[in-house]
């Protein structure tokens, strides 16, 4: 018997961290919610990270997902910006882990391939396919749309992850 799994996808960013929640039952996907957690750019870094953590924690408490998926960040030429993005990504991994959720991570190309069929594509293609896959989906920012795409990617890949975890448990036990 198949069970409904509620998944939160998180698109980390220091200014805006997108979140999107879907329910997966077999091959069927249903939109639950999406949004963006923001931090105040005028505050110090530690305070901004606290804002992101508090915002994500509220979303997790409100929607009670079963699993989480976070996108890997890319390294750019600005080392300081990359480091700050990495710290925001740490919050995106920490909040669901603290809530007791298993957290999967996906490269941007894997997300694109799961949603649009190829590993390289434009954001507009991803956003359009999110709407095709879940016609009731709504998102107010690009970050929220990307987070929904991350959740969709996890819904497509989760069975192989679950099987691998079971195999590890059998080998360890």
From Swiss-Prot:
Family: Belongs to the RuvC family.
Reaction catalyzed: Endonucleolytic cleavage at a junction such as a reciprocal single-stranded crossover between two homologous DNA duplexes (Holliday junction)
Pfam family, one: RuvC
Cofactor(s) it depends on: Mg(2+)
Cellular compartment(s): Cytoplasm
Gene3D superfamilies the UniProt entry points to: Ribonuclease H-like superfamily/Ribonuclease H
Species assigned in the record: Brucella canis (strain ATCC 23365 / NCTC 10854 / RM-666)
SUPFAM superfamilies recorded: Ribonuclease H-like
GO biological processes: DNA recombination; DNA repair
GO molecular function, one term: crossover junction DNA endonuclease activity
GO cellular component: cytoplasm; Holliday junction resolvase complex
PROSITE patterns recorded: RUVC
Annotated binding of Mg(2+) 2, by residue: 71
Binding partners and assembly: Homodimer which binds Holliday junction (HJ) DNA. The HJ becomes 2-fold symmetrical on binding to RuvC with unstacked arms; it has a different conformation from HJ DNA in complex with RuvA. In the full resolvosome a probable DNA-RuvA(4)-RuvB(12)-RuvC(2) complex forms which resolves the HJ.
Record function comment: The RuvA-RuvB-RuvC complex processes Holliday junction (HJ) DNA during genetic recombination and DNA repair. Endonuclease that resolves HJ intermediates. Cleaves cruciform DNA by making single-stranded nicks across the HJ at symmetrical positions within the homologous arms, yielding a 5'-phosphate and a 3'-hydroxyl group; requires a central core of homology in the junction. The consensus cleavage sequence is 5'-(A/T)TT(C/G)-3'. Cleavage occurs on the 3'-side of the TT dinucleotide at the point of strand exchange.
Active site: 11, 71, 143
Cofactor binding note: Binds 2 Mg(2+) ion per subunit.
Protein name (record): Crossover junction endodeoxyribonuclease RuvC
Record-listed Mg(2+) 1 binding positions: 11, 143
Cross-referenced InterPro entries: RNaseH-like_sf, RNaseH_sf, X-over_junc_endoDNase_Mg_BS, X-over_junc_endoDNase_RuvC
This protein's UniProt keywords: Cytoplasm, DNA damage, DNA recombination, DNA repair, DNA-binding, Endonuclease, Hydrolase, Magnesium, Metal-binding, Nuclease
EC number: 3.1.21.10
CDD domains membership: RuvC (cd16962)
Major location (coarse): cytoplasm
């Amino acid at each position: 018997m198949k069970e409904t799994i509620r998944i939160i996808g998180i698109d980390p960013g220091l200014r805006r961290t997108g979140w999107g929640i879907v329910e997966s039952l077999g091959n069927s996907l249903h939109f639950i919610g999406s949004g963006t957690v923001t931090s105040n750019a005028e505050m110090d870094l530690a305070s901004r990270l606290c804002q992101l953590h508090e915002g994500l924690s509220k979303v997790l408490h409100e929607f009670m997902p079963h699993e989480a998926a976070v996108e890997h960040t890319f390294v750019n030429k600005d080392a300081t910006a990359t480091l700050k993005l990495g710290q925001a990504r740490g919050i995106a991994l920490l909040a669901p882990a603290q809530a007791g959720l298993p957290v999967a991570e996906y490269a941007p190309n894997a997300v694109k391939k799961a949603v649009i069929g190829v590993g390289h594509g434009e954001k507009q293609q991803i956003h359009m396919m999110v709407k095709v896959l879940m016609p009731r989906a709504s998102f107010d920012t690009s970050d929220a749309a990307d987070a929904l795409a991350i959740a969709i990617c996890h819904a497509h890949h989760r069975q192989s992850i679950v099987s691998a975890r079971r195999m590890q448990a059998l080998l360890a036990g």
